[in-house]
């Protein structure tokens, strides 16, 4: 039985974040609720990200790919053993979105991968794992995925 009742995991569709989903699902198992979150910035609000990130911008702007990312992550979570899985697309920067969601849901654990978007995106958005671990008020698991 899991000591955690609610687990939040962030994904941007990267291999690293999907491995974090796998680990979060294993922890949640059949007993805990697993919330898979993906943050995005609407293109009309952050056209600058699209200019800077080019081909990688779809991971943080617009809504179309978010639902596919969340669907794929939910399927992976079920395959890894999670039973109670919710998907949450969230408008906002990844760190703010994950920390706020964990607070709102009274999560016991927040899970992120140790590597996220490309180096350029990381420079633009900052290190999600480092910033989440500093700001979260709940346990944070940084899954080594490299």
Curated annotation (Swiss-Prot):
SUPFAM superfamilies, A to Z: Adenine nucleotide alpha hydrolases-like
Gene3D superfamilies attached to this UniProt entry: HUPs
Pfam families: Usp
Family annotation (InterPro entries): Rossmann-like_a/b/a_fold, Universal_stress_UspA, UspA
One Gene Ontology term from the biological process aspect of the record: response to antibiotic
GO CC annotations on file: peptidoglycan-based cell wall; plasma membrane
Family: Belongs to the universal stress protein A family.
PANTHER family in alphabetical order: STRESS RESPONSE PROTEIN NHAX (PTHR46268), UNIVERSAL STRESS PROTEIN UP12 (PTHR46268:SF6)
Protein's UniProt name: Universal stress protein Rv1636
